[in-house]
């Protein structure tokens, strides 16, 4: 008889080898697939991070795609100046030049009649005159007392360019656009031989119940916090300080039993706005017990500690914190490179190779 295998046995061995090979390949493929969940309160910069991934890893926005953002740029610009004018009434701030009151009335008429994606020379002129007014500027400087888009000054200062008839938004203009995210936006890209799937989840509280089914098997959570929110209240709740809301949400995510083995990456975002704001608005508005100086370094480090201290499993769970400016492509590229290295290291650990 000897040890020769029958044709049937040989086929079984081949089948077994093939199954092993497929399992190995599936395992390697799974190890290369990274699911990232972007979480954070509303307007913390999640969608801007997603846009940066497209710019950094997918050759950015085509001219055609940029053109599609023209209507959003105009809408954001008009809504910003309207928000400031409305706030002037509430805050009892007068126009520096009384002639601007006519421009304000004209603004509401022209904005109401404006065709989507177009800005007439007349409307642009009205907005420009209003924006230059000392009373409007005084109201803008008190924007923490009402809801105003972060991109307001960016667009209003550049009105000459964006009001041109042949205007096409730049990548930076697109990054600065603000559209409330509803539902879940999924983005795919490849970087350092890893296949990323990034999920951007609607930040406002009414949207949070939609997150839950995204959570299973995520590699890491990127949690965005707007540092500059320390002196603001929520859009959905005029009583709740935005930073406190962020901390509450971070606590519930960081210490959630589902995420015991999930890497948590904390993006303390809008560091550029925070650096400007901390010179004028003390940190004690948010943290009355804070006794440090109102310098960027000391105040930012204090906020970092406030979030990291919420981690109840410090011995087994590490929080990877980065200070970011989501509208700065170079900064996001640098930070995301570091984040990817952490993910690779943790993946190797999970496979027993590190």
UniProtKB/Swiss-Prot annotation:
<dbReference type="InterPro" id="IPR001408">
    <property type="entry name" value="Gprotein_alpha_I"/>
</dbReference>
<dbReference type="GO" id="GO:0046676">
    <property type="term" value="P:negative regulation of insulin secretion"/>
</dbReference>
<keyword id="KW-0813">Transport</keyword>
<comment type="similarity">
    <text>Belongs to the G-alpha family. G(i/o/t/z) subfamily.</text>
</comment>
<feature type="region of interest" description="G2 motif">
    <location>
        <begin position="173"/>
        <end position="181"/>
    </location>
</feature>
<feature type="binding site">
    <location>
        <begin position="269"/>
        <end position="272"/>
    </location>
    <ligand>
        <name>GTP</name>
    </ligand>
</feature>
<feature type="binding site">
    <location>
        <begin position="175"/>
        <end position="181"/>
    </location>
    <ligand>
        <name>GTP</name>
    </ligand>
</feature>
<dbReference type="GO" id="GO:0019003">
    <property type="term" value="F:GDP binding"/>
</dbReference>
<feature type="modified residue" description="ADP-ribosylcysteine; by pertussis toxin">
    <location>
        <position position="351"/>
    </location>
</feature>
<dbReference type="GO" id="GO:0031749">
    <property type="term" value="F:D2 dopamine receptor binding"/>
</dbReference>
<keyword id="KW-0479">Metal-binding</keyword>
<dbReference type="GO" id="GO:0005813">
    <property type="term" value="C:centrosome"/>
</dbReference>
<dbReference type="GO" id="GO:0005829">
    <property type="term" value="C:cytosol"/>
</dbReference>
<dbReference type="GO" id="GO:0007193">
    <property type="term" value="P:adenylate cyclase-inhibiting G protein-coupled receptor signaling pathway"/>
</dbReference>
<feature type="region of interest" description="G5 motif">
    <location>
        <begin position="324"/>
        <end position="329"/>
    </location>
</feature>
<dbReference type="GO" id="GO:0043434">
    <property type="term" value="P:response to peptide hormone"/>
</dbReference>
<keyword id="KW-0991">Intellectual disability</keyword>
<feature type="region of interest" description="G3 motif">
    <location>
        <begin position="196"/>
        <end position="205"/>
    </location>
</feature>
<dbReference type="InterPro" id="IPR027417">
    <property type="entry name" value="P-loop_NTPase"/>
</dbReference>
<keyword id="KW-0131">Cell cycle</keyword>
<dbReference type="GO" id="GO:0005886">
    <property type="term" value="C:plasma membrane"/>
</dbReference>
<keyword id="KW-0564">Palmitate</keyword>
<dbReference type="InterPro" id="IPR001019">
    <property type="entry name" value="Gprotein_alpha_su"/>
</dbReference>
<keyword id="KW-0887">Epilepsy</keyword>
<dbReference type="GO" id="GO:0007186">
    <property type="term" value="P:G protein-coupled receptor signaling pathway"/>
</dbReference>
<dbReference type="GO" id="GO:0031683">
    <property type="term" value="F:G-protein beta/gamma-subunit complex binding"/>
</dbReference>
<dbReference type="GO" id="GO:0010854">
    <property type="term" value="F:adenylate cyclase regulator activity"/>
</dbReference>
<dbReference type="GO" id="GO:0072678">
    <property type="term" value="P:T cell migration"/>
</dbReference>
<dbReference type="GO" id="GO:0010855">
    <property type="term" value="F:adenylate cyclase inhibitor activity"/>
</dbReference>
<dbReference type="GO" id="GO:1904778">
    <property type="term" value="P:positive regulation of protein localization to cell cortex"/>
</dbReference>
<dbReference type="GO" id="GO:1904322">
    <property type="term" value="P:cellular response to forskolin"/>
</dbReference>
<dbReference type="GO" id="GO:0045542">
    <property type="term" value="P:positive regulation of cholesterol biosynthetic process"/>
</dbReference>
<keyword id="KW-1003">Cell membrane</keyword>
<dbReference type="GO" id="GO:0005737">
    <property type="term" value="C:cytoplasm"/>
</dbReference>
<keyword id="KW-0539">Nucleus</keyword>
<keyword id="KW-0342">GTP-binding</keyword>
<dbReference type="InterPro" id="IPR011025">
    <property type="entry name" value="GproteinA_insert"/>
</dbReference>
<dbReference type="GO" id="GO:0060236">
    <property type="term" value="P:regulation of mitotic spindle organization"/>
</dbReference>
<keyword id="KW-0807">Transducer</keyword>
<dbReference type="GO" id="GO:0005730">
    <property type="term" value="C:nucleolus"/>
</dbReference>
<dbReference type="GO" id="GO:0003924">
    <property type="term" value="F:GTPase activity"/>
</dbReference>
<dbReference type="GO" id="GO:0005834">
    <property type="term" value="C:heterotrimeric G-protein complex"/>
</dbReference>
């Amino acid at each position: 008889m000897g040890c020769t295998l029958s044709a049937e046995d040989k086929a079984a061995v081949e089948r077994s080898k093939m199954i092993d090979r497929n399992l190995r390949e599936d395992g390697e493929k799974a190890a290369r697939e990274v699911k990232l969940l972007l979480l954070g309160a509303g307007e913390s910069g999640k969608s801007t991070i997603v846009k940066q991934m497209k710019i950094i890893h997918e050759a950015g926005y085509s001219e055609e795609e940029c053109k599609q953002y023209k209507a959003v740029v105009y809408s954001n610009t008009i809504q910003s100046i309207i928000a400031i004018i409305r706030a002037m009434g509430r805050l009892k701030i007068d126009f520096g030049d009384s002639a601007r009151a006519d421009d304000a009335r004209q603004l509401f008429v022209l904005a109401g009649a404006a065709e989507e994606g177009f800005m007439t020379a007349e409307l642009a002129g009205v907005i420009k005159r209003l924006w230059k007014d000392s009373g409007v500027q005084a109201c803008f400087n008190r924007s923490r007392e009402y809801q105003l888009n972060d991109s307001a000054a960016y667009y209003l200062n550049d009105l000459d360019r964006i009001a041109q008839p042949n205007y096409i938004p730049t990548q930076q203009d697109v990054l600065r656009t603000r559209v409330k995210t509803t539902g879940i936006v999924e983005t795919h890209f490849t970087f350092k031989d890893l296949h990323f799937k990034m999920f951007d989840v609607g930040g406002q509280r009414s949207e949070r119940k939609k997150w839950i089914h995204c959570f299973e098997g995520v590699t890491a959570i990127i949690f965005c916090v707007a540092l500059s929110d320390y002196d603001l209240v929520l859009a959905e709740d005029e009583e709740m300080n935005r930073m406190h809301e962020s901390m509450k949400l971070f606590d519930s995510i960081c210490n959630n039993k589902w995420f015991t083995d999930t890497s948590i990456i904390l993006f303390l975002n809008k560091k550029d706005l925070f650096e400007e704001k901390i010179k004028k608005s003390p940190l004690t508005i948010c943290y009355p017990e804070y006794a440090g100086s109102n310098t960027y370094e000391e105040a930012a480090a204090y906020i970092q500690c406030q979030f990291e201290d919420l981690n109840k499993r410090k011995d087994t769970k590490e929080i990877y914190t980065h200070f970011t400016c989501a509208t700065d492509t170079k900064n996001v590229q640098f930070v995301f490179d570091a984040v990817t290295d952490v993910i690779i290291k943790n993946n190797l650990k999970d496979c027993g190779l590190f």
